Amino acid sequence: MIALDAFAASVTTDQPPAGSSPALQALWWARRGDWARAHECVQAHEGEPDCDSVHAHLHREEGDLSNAGYWYRRAGRPVSQQSLEAEWTALATELLGPSR
Protein backbone atom coordinates (compact mmCIF):
# COMPACT_ATOMS: atom_id res chain seq x y z
CA MET A 1 0.00 0.00 0.00
CA ILE A 2 0.98 3.61 -0.45
CA ALA A 3 2.80 5.57 2.29
CA LEU A 4 1.00 8.31 4.22
CA ASP A 5 3.01 11.18 2.72
CA ALA A 6 2.42 9.88 -0.81
CA PHE A 7 -1.28 9.42 -0.09
CA ALA A 8 -1.60 12.98 1.24
CA ALA A 9 0.36 14.37 -1.72
CA SER A 10 -1.81 12.46 -4.19
CA VAL A 11 -4.64 14.95 -3.71
CA THR A 12 -3.05 16.99 -6.49
CA THR A 13 -4.16 14.27 -8.93
CA ASP A 14 -7.68 13.79 -10.30
CA GLN A 15 -8.62 10.57 -8.50
CA PRO A 16 -7.74 8.71 -5.30
CA PRO A 17 -4.91 6.18 -5.65
CA ALA A 18 -5.97 2.97 -7.36
CA GLY A 19 -7.06 0.29 -4.94
CA SER A 20 -8.01 2.72 -2.18
CA SER A 21 -10.78 1.48 0.10
CA PRO A 22 -14.00 3.52 0.31
CA ALA A 23 -12.86 4.93 3.67
CA LEU A 24 -9.53 6.03 2.18
CA GLN A 25 -11.30 7.49 -0.83
CA ALA A 26 -13.45 9.54 1.55
CA LEU A 27 -10.38 10.84 3.39
CA TRP A 28 -8.80 11.68 0.04
CA TRP A 29 -11.86 13.68 -1.11
CA ALA A 30 -12.04 15.40 2.27
CA ARG A 31 -8.40 16.45 1.98
CA ARG A 32 -9.21 17.90 -1.46
CA GLY A 33 -11.98 19.94 0.12
CA ASP A 34 -14.85 18.01 -1.46
CA TRP A 35 -16.85 17.19 1.67
CA ALA A 36 -19.94 16.10 -0.29
CA ARG A 37 -18.00 13.58 -2.36
CA ALA A 38 -16.25 12.28 0.76
CA HIS A 39 -19.61 11.89 2.48
CA GLU A 40 -21.02 9.97 -0.49
CA CYS A 41 -18.15 7.48 -0.23
CA VAL A 42 -18.80 6.63 3.41
CA GLN A 43 -22.56 6.88 3.26
CA ALA A 44 -22.59 4.18 0.58
CA HIS A 45 -20.80 1.86 3.04
CA GLU A 46 -22.70 2.46 6.28
CA GLY A 47 -22.09 -0.27 8.82
CA GLU A 48 -18.48 -0.84 7.80
CA PRO A 49 -16.42 0.26 10.82
CA ASP A 50 -13.71 2.01 8.77
CA CYS A 51 -16.30 4.01 6.85
CA ASP A 52 -18.27 4.77 10.00
CA SER A 53 -15.07 6.13 11.60
CA VAL A 54 -14.42 8.42 8.65
CA HIS A 55 -18.13 9.34 8.59
CA ALA A 56 -17.75 10.55 12.20
CA HIS A 57 -14.70 12.60 11.26
CA LEU A 58 -16.56 14.23 8.37
CA HIS A 59 -19.48 15.31 10.56
CA ARG A 60 -17.06 16.60 13.16
CA GLU A 61 -15.33 18.56 10.39
CA GLU A 62 -18.63 20.17 9.37
CA GLY A 63 -19.37 21.04 13.00
CA ASP A 64 -22.30 18.63 13.43
CA LEU A 65 -21.05 17.17 16.70
CA SER A 66 -24.21 15.29 17.62
CA ASN A 67 -24.20 13.48 14.27
CA ALA A 68 -20.46 12.89 14.63
CA GLY A 69 -21.10 11.34 18.04
CA TYR A 70 -23.62 8.96 16.50
CA TRP A 71 -21.06 7.77 13.94
CA TYR A 72 -18.30 7.40 16.54
CA ARG A 73 -20.67 5.15 18.51
CA ARG A 74 -21.53 3.18 15.37
CA ALA A 75 -17.80 2.73 14.72
CA GLY A 76 -17.19 1.64 18.32
CA ARG A 77 -14.84 4.53 18.98
CA PRO A 78 -14.75 7.33 21.52
CA VAL A 79 -15.35 10.84 20.21
CA SER A 80 -12.00 12.16 19.03
CA GLN A 81 -10.35 14.87 21.11
CA GLN A 82 -7.62 15.38 18.50
CA SER A 83 -7.46 18.30 16.11
CA LEU A 84 -9.16 17.56 12.81
CA GLU A 85 -5.77 17.40 11.10
CA ALA A 86 -4.39 14.97 13.67
CA GLU A 87 -7.48 12.80 13.42
CA TRP A 88 -7.28 12.77 9.60
CA THR A 89 -3.64 11.68 9.85
CA ALA A 90 -4.43 9.00 12.45
CA LEU A 91 -7.28 7.59 10.36
CA ALA A 92 -5.22 7.62 7.16
CA THR A 93 -2.29 5.96 8.93
CA GLU A 94 -4.56 3.26 10.34
CA LEU A 95 -6.26 2.62 6.99
CA LEU A 96 -2.97 2.56 5.10
CA GLY A 97 -1.37 0.28 7.69
CA PRO A 98 0.40 -2.96 6.79
CA SER A 99 -2.38 -5.09 8.29
CA ARG A 100 -4.87 -3.89 5.69
Over which residues does each language-model region extend?
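Terminal, low-structured helical/coil segments at or just beyond the last alpha-helical repeat
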Residues: 84-100
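Solenoid-like repeat scaffolds
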Residues: 9-16, 40-49, 76-80
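Inward-facing hydrophobic residues that define packing positions of alpha-helical scaffold repeats
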Residues: 8, 23, 35, 42-43, ...
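TPR/TPR-like (Sel1-like) alpha-helical repeat modules
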Residues: 47, 60-82
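Solenoid-repeat scaffolds in large eukaryotic assemblies
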Residues: 37-38, 68
